[in-house]
Regions:
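GIY-YIG nuclease catalytic motif and its immediate N-terminal context
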Residues: 1-45, 49-52, 56-66, 71, ...
Length: 96
């Protein structure tokens, strides 16, 4: 399986999107600072993921979620989470 996932930084409230074949191991790498892109922004919380059987589908979905339309989709999909965490009122969602 291929997993597309969204993490939220608990230090700066930023978001990070990526994909992996082993979601648990990859999350552990993010938490342990083993990923250059996220090492300085942890700890991280997994807030959303999708599973795909084909790599190409996961890569396409990752690319979409990083686009403007993808950010709008995530904003709608995570509406309750973002409202509870105070993002909706500020109109803020930052996706790396």
């Amino acid at each position: 399986m291929f997993y597309v996932y969204v993490l939220r930084s608990e230090s700066d409230s930023g978001f990070y999107i990526d994909f992996s074949t082993n979601l648990r191991a990859r999350l552990r790498q993010h938490q342990d600072g083993e990923s250059f892109a996220t090492s300085y922004r942890g700890p991280w919380k997994l807030i959303y993921y999708e599973a795909y059987t084909e790599r190409e589908d996961a890569e396409g979905r990752e690319k979409f979620l990083k686009s403007g339309a993808g950010r709008r989709f995530l904003r709608a999909q995570l509406r309750h989470y973002l409202r509870v965490k105070g993002f909706a009122s500020r109109g803020l969602i930052v996706l790396s």
